[in-house]
Swiss-Prot record:
Binding site for substrate: 95, 105, 133, 223
Catalytic activity: (2R,3S)-3-isopropylmalate + NAD(+) = 4-methyl-2-oxopentanoate + CO2 + NADH
GO biological process annotation, one example: L-leucine biosynthetic process
HAMAP family: LeuB_type1 (MF_01033)
Membership in a protein family: Belongs to the isocitrate and isopropylmalate dehydrogenases family. LeuB type 1 subfamily.
Functional summary from the UniProt entry: Catalyzes the oxidation of 3-carboxy-2-hydroxy-4-methylpentanoate (3-isopropylmalate) to 3-carboxy-4-methyl-2-oxopentanoate. The product decarboxylates to 4-methyl-2 oxopentanoate.
Residue(s) at site: Important for catalysis: 140, 191
Lineage: Bacteria, Pseudomonadati, Pseudomonadota, Betaproteobacteria, Neisseriales
One term under GO cellular component: cytosol
Coiled coil: none
Disulfide bonds: none
Protein name as catalogued: 3-isopropylmalate dehydrogenase
Protein encoded by which gene: leuB
């Protein structure tokens, strides 16, 4: 049965990196992948066209699709819009709308990029971490929230951090099942010494862990985890954490690899439907200059093939093509070093197509 993919170009470098990824998808379809795709706007592009960052047209297409591929959202030109209309709100809305509760962000260091990391090669060589982040709860979505005026006339900002047992249980299962396919270690990260939310998180993880006796469970406070990611990152296999801590730690982990431009991500619902996007932002400073690194988006397509289309063979085919291009010494500016060949976004796309 033909699988349907919704493609959202987004803002900034989004259209450029998506264009290269769609060329890869077209080649896979030509080689026999039974899939089709359709475009829809999200973020600033959607606001310009429909007056909303996640319009009804996009909602309908994404709800019907088997998977969604996204470039990036956000641009400084929208910073003065009311908060609900800003591009980033489109991303929060699609996650909530499709009930994408599990965010998987791998941080893998390719041997060819060992020198691109800011850490010593011996500390990061062979790095392979998966951060499993809960995506629809926590302080980003908790109510009540807002800015209010106190009796003394002073303004106060307030947010609510909370997690229910069921929200914690389902992300725990994702973390343990992911670890079973890897090195069988889960590190649950929170701040249980001061936050009741993560005290409950730890308790539930202990309970669910008993269902996975083959997986080793440990716990770490988030401040220590942030330090350990820099001190000795290879101790980690799967890191499982809440929304706000996961947001921060996954960005930190990405820099261990030398470039956030190399890192894909998947956000999944309970049935394997997902939103796939690079971990980096929309990089408006280089938009339209053909400088962006499309590899994270191409690797996001590989995750889409793996998790939503259940096509492990083609997922590996794409990942192998990316590694081959790196072995050939081709680099976009974000991962360039002396002795390698500097290429543009489209030239990197050409190289991946050739490697396929």
């Amino acid at each position: 049965m033909t699988k349907h993919i919704a493609i959202l170009r987004g803002d900034g470098i989004g259209p450029e990196i998506v264009a290269e990824t769609v060329r890869v998808l077209d080649k896979l379809i030509a080689q026999g992948l039974d899939a089709g795709y359709e475009y829809a706007p999200l973020g600033g592009e959607a606001y310009d066209e429909y007056g909303h960052p996640y319009p009804e047209f996009t909602q309908n297409l994404c709800r019907k699709a088997d998977a969604v591929l996204l470039g990036a959202v956000g641009s400084p030109q929208y910073d003065n819009l009311d908060r609900p209309l800003r591009p980033e709100r489109g991303l929060l809305a699609i996650r909530k709308d499709l009930n994408l509760f599990a965010n998987l962000r791998p941080a893998v260091l390719y041997p060819e990029l060992a020198n691109a990391s800011t850490l010593k090669p011996e500390i990061v060589a062979g790095l392979d971490i998966l951060i499993v982040r809960e995506l629809t709860g926590d302080i980003y979505f908790g109510e009540p929230r807002g800015i209010r005026v106190l009796e003394n006339g002073e303004r106060e900002g307030y947010n609510t951090m909370k997690y229910s047992e069921s929200e914690i249980r389902r992300i725990a299962h994702v973390a343990f099942q992911s670890a079973q396919k890897r090195s069988k270690k889960v590190c649950s990260v929170g701040k249980a010494n001061v936050l009741e939310t993560t005290e409950l998180w730890r308790e539930i993880f202990e309970e669910i862990g008993k269902e996975y006796p083959d997986v080793e469970l440990s716990h770490m406070y988030v401040d220590n985890a942030a330090m350990q990611l820099v001190r000795a990152p290879k101790q980690f296999d799967v890191i499982a954490t809440g929304n706000i801590f996961g947001d921060i730690l996954s960005d930190e982990a990405s820099m261990l690899t030398g470039s956030i431009g190399m890192l894909p991500s998947a956000s999944l619902d309970e049935n394997g439907k997902g939103l796939y996007e690079p971990s980096h932002g929309s990089a408006p400073d280089i938009a339209g200059q053909n400088k962006a690194n499309p590899l994270a988006t191409i690797l996001s397509l590989a995750m889409l093939l793996r998790y939503s289309l259940n096509d492990e063979a083609r997922a590996q085919q794409v990942e192998n093509a990316v590694q081959k291009v790196l072995q050939q010494g081709l680099r976009t500016s974000d991962i360039y070093e002396e002795g390698t060949k500097l290429v543009s976004c489209s030239e990197m796309g050409d190289a991946v197509l050739a490697a396929l």
